[in-house]
């Protein structure tokens, strides 16, 4: 069975893994998933990530907890295959008044809403993380 939305699958695996207090979650790897994981690590939402395997690479994301509670409180997919959401640089959302991060796919690659605003770029809003 083919997967219709691999990014939603990734976010759901992370959400479910944290709900079950897992140390790490595994999923099929892609360049976009690795870029999202790198952004989550840079923003401090996950401990680490690694790509394993050659023929069918798997992405392993090590989840982060603080005082036995998941660091990620909210993980919401915004732009999806059925309804793409694009924003100009002036209309980029601020998640939870700046406490969260909007993952934005720009012409210069994947970046946070703050970095996109600083670079003067708009793009597709992939997800919200808080």
From Swiss-Prot:
Entry's transmembrane regions: none
A family per Pfam: Ribosomal_S8
Family matches, as Gene3D superfamilies: 3.30.1370.30, 3.30.1490.10
PROSITE patterns, per database record: RIBOSOMAL_S8 (PS00053)
Keywords: Ribonucleoprotein, Ribosomal protein, RNA-binding, rRNA-binding
Ribonucleoprotein is among the record's keywords: yes
GO BP, sorted A to Z: translation
GO molecular function, one term: structural constituent of ribosome
GO cellular component, one term: ribosome
UniProt-listed NCBIfam families: PRK00136.1
Record function comment: One of the primary rRNA binding proteins, it binds directly to 16S rRNA central domain where it helps coordinate assembly of the platform of the 30S subunit.
Complex and partners: Part of the 30S ribosomal subunit. Contacts proteins S5 and S12.
Classification via PANTHER family: 40S RIBOSOMAL PROTEIN S15A (PTHR11758)
Record's protein name: Small ribosomal subunit protein uS8
GN (gene name): rpsH
